[in-house]
Swiss-Prot record:
It is found in: Membrane. This is Nitrosoguanidine resistance protein SNG1. It comes from Saccharomyces cerevisiae (strain ATCC 204508 / S288c). Residues 50-62 have a biased composition (Basic and acidic residues). To yeast YJR015W.
Amino acid sequence: MTKSVGDEESQYIEDPSFAAAAAFTGGRDGVSYSNQRFAEGSGHSSDLAKSLEDYRPPDEKPSSLSSVGEGGANEEEKGGNDGGPLARIQTGLFSPRLRNHRKKILSKFVLNNFFIACVCVSLISIYWGACYGTDRYFFKVKNIVVLQDAPSNTSVQSISAIIPSLLASVPGTWHIYNATSFHRKFGTTNSTEIDRKIVDLIYDERYWLALNVKPNATDTLYNSLISQDANSEFNSSIFFESVFESGRDPSSVKSTILPLMQQLEVRLQKYYVKEYLPSLMSNITSNDRDLNINMENWAIAGQLLFTYNDYRPFADRILMAPLQVGLIYCILLTVLQLSLYGKLHGEMARVLKPKHILIYRLLISWATYFLLSIGFCTVSAIFRIDFTPAFGRGGFVVYWMSTWLVMMAVGGANENVLSLVIAYCPPYLSIWLMTWIILNISASFYPMVLNNEFYRYGYIMPIHNAVDIYKVIFLNLTKRKMGRNYGILVAWVALNTSLMPFCMKFAGKKMQKNAMQAAEAAVAAATQRASRPAEANTDKNNNPPGN
């Protein structure tokens, strides 16, 4: 059956995003027939035929036109009008012909490096800023101090009485209670309930640090000083307990927040050794000159130390992999799967209806994330990470399903944005990837209380909520926030899914426009070449091509 040039041109315009490929690889019949029409001198069809002839591979072309030099003149030809091929002549970098090219190179070099410098200053500074000026935000670190000690001897001042004054010079926001006010505030009735409630407050993340000064601290010290019984020695670590959870933030609790409690300990030690204990000993000896002193008890009483109880310790360094850098790889994996499916997505887009394209893309993406997530989680299992602290033997399944949800959240955003970036500005693809990673990790790897208010956007970022969930799985932290964490991740999946049709539509229109512009440029170039003198297309015997 005869195939008209008009049909070939119609296909070229109807599917512009694949026009060049169709003309280059699948349109050989069209090329040969178009050449015949060109020889016959047809009008517009000859232009298209010439354009298709130019897109043929070099080994299939009977000849190629000479290249145009910088000044517009044809460069040196190899072969000429004897039917031999024409080719570009390569030259040196410092050739006078490349003067304009050298200017272009210099201009691009300056502009590109200026742009990269701006990216470094604007994007990377976001991450650096999350670690900068930490001491300026200590006022947001809430801590609690409970002073249960109340001496039975009213003539003796409590050891802990000075603590409120000392806290005035220690950074942080300190909430101070005695036993009575604590009972009234939190509904406890005795010392045991106070001890338990303090641990619960730290576990529920109401406070970062707690100091619990237990009852009878001063009485025990006083009795050890006046008693000859060696068993009545004063052990300060029994009465001064500091409670915290290093697992709440492995990078900052021990290195940045816990030193606040240690500052208080140092100040209290200094006061105790230089003022309180000498005054107490002086009162004891002046009131009872015949007292037989147990010098060992007096020596032991000369030191005051806190007990530091870490109820959720961060003890296994391998956990830094899934809790921090591993989440960056999680983002990158979602981009990898998108690039691997790119060619297939293009093929399916030509044969599926718009509605079914959306269904196909969602099914492929979610199924891929499902398998990617189990592979990602298996790496943690290979390195013997414990999944059981919070959910027992089901911990791995919780980790797997959570990772799948995280991948759908970050991957869906990548898929939508990258489709627009590729359509409108492909060179900036890496800029989006850097931006997405930095925005996520800057507000996730460090506690909000030690950052500027700017970083509060992190509460809605997928990686921040993933970190909170993983800390529960691996470190058995409070589950109080898990509902919010999962809700935000589901919201991301829903948002990405609802935006996908619009992103695909805008990207498709832009790519279609780009393809049409390329097609018009090709036709214009073909028209210009076809308008050259007829003798430029004849061989040395003045025979038309194909005869």
